[in-house]
């Protein structure tokens, strides 16, 4: 299975840099068996049935991009350097792993100041990543980070414009509650309160799970034989309550539909050992590509993904490679907007 099998031509202008307003007005491509329909996210009301269960990732994106100043005394007097930091994940010892640019301009033991309230000491460097120990913790840290940090927009958006205050709302789901992600579960960005209310009134049910999306989600696949690719690991949790709700839906013969690839990867991770959904917590590096046997997901709502990405491989596993090629060719022809701030698809195998 070759990397080129998952490539396609995407015009640059179809990469969205801002989301649709309101959220649920984004376009929705529905692929069911051999049919393709074009509509809006609000049309989910026509495609979902009473008893269907949407699985939603409730992770909260942290404003993980920080710009700091390093101060140092030299023979010529005080000197400073600007260091850009992208926080990656908290460590067991209370420090944070992060990407520091340029790393060569700061030494272990030196301090970065991000604002009057927030600073951090570089305590170690591991595999090219800095380990930062902040001066604050808990709610005080969260508040200072919210003030000093910017949203960690994906590289293909950040290359076109800097993050701004609007992104702190736009790049967050309306139900986000468990902080820890450095990328959003972007299919979920299409939901607003009116749509959730309308779906609930129709009899669609919701289950919340948590997968803290990491920066590794944007890493390119560098091997030609995709089956040898090593996935990054991300922390996730399916609570006993969530597992019971999903199991009950399956037992009743109704559909379980994850919203986003993160929710899908998590619930399939939770079913890997027994074949059925069970409570689960830990690091998952599940890699889903054609040939994968889905045990929980009956369909998937997801955005349109990058060529040659692991997420293109995932949707190809669900729908079949030829089918996905046709779906994506249709999306390009009809000028759907792609990637994190783009439009959505509902894939029903």
UniProtKB/Swiss-Prot annotation:
The protein's annotated pathway: tRNA modification; tRNA-queuosine biosynthesis
- An annotated GO BP: queuosine biosynthetic process
Any Pfam family the entry gives: Queuosine_synth
Compartment(s): Cytoplasm
Family stated for the protein in its record: Belongs to the QueA family.
* UniProtKB keywords: Cytoplasm, Queuosine biosynthesis, S-adenosyl-L-methionine, Transferase
What task does this protein carry out?
A: Transfers and isomerizes the ribose moiety from AdoMet to the 7-aminomethyl group of 7-deazaguanine (preQ1-tRNA) to give epoxyqueuosine (oQ-tRNA).
Question: Which NCBIfam families does the UniProt entry name for this protein?
Answer: PRK00147.1, queA
Q: What is its EC number?
A: 2.4.99.17
The reply on keyword Nucleus is no
GO cellular component terms listed in the entry, alphabetical order: cytoplasm
Q: Is the keyword S-adenosyl-L-methionine assigned to this protein?
A: yes
Assembly and interaction partners: Monomer.
Which Gene Ontology MF annotations are present?
A: S-adenosylmethionine:tRNA ribosyltransferase-isomerase activity
User: Which reaction is this enzyme known to catalyze?
Assistant: 7-aminomethyl-7-carbaguanosine(34) in tRNA + S-adenosyl-L-methionine = epoxyqueuosine(34) in tRNA + adenine + L-methionine + 2 H(+)
What is the protein's given name?
Answer: S-adenosylmethionine:tRNA ribosyltransferase-isomerase
Designated gene of the protein: queA
